[in-house]
């Protein structure tokens, strides 16, 4: 409520109070203001306790949905989807976590290993490079393309 009030404003109010009220009466006024704030806080807390004591049972049915809405507002999108769709089964949504997918062994890892350890040249599984001049692609324009 008073988060925008800083030390310069407080100092200004004290100086104005000193000028308007006077140095003789200022300590008594500060003590009275402090006592009034304390009495107001005490009255508010007593009213809260009385309302909670007298009407606590009737308001319990309202507190549960309000607390549920407040907990949903504090959740992130992943937690809300998990709660709504999968009855809070966290493991199901963790299966779709991209960080875990990339960290686990996938086909991408096998592909990277194949690139690091190439197969021997004499292996029959590797494709042979064609030695025929016609089958190799040519760069640019050629009369062979037209005829």
Curated annotation (Swiss-Prot):
Disulfide bonds: none annotated. One of its GO terms (molecular function) is protein transmembrane transporter activity. InterPro entries: TatB (IPR018448). The Tat system comprises two distinct complexes: a TatABC complex, containing multiple copies of TatA, TatB and TatC subunits, and a separate TatA complex, containing only TatA subunits. Substrates initially bind to the TatABC complex, which probably triggers association of the separate TatA complex to form the active translocon. The keyword Transmembrane helix applies. It is a single-pass membrane protein. Part of the twin-arginine translocation (Tat) system that transports large folded proteins containing a characteristic twin-arginine motif in their signal peptide across membranes. Together with TatC, TatB is part of a receptor directly interacting with Tat signal peptides. TatB may form an oligomeric binding site that transiently accommodates folded Tat precursor proteins before their translocation. It is found in: Cell membrane. This is Sec-independent protein translocase protein TatB. HAMAP family: TatB. Its main location: membrane. NCBIfam families: PRK00182.1. Keywords: Cell membrane, Membrane, Protein transport, Translocation, Transmembrane, Transmembrane helix, Transport. The chain crosses the membrane at residues 2-22. Residues 96-147 are annotated as: Disordered. GO terms for biological process: protein transport by the Tat complex. Belongs to the TatB family. It comes from the Bacteria. The lineage of its organism: Bacteria, Bacillati, Actinomycetota, Actinomycetes, Mycobacteriales. Signal peptide: none annotated.
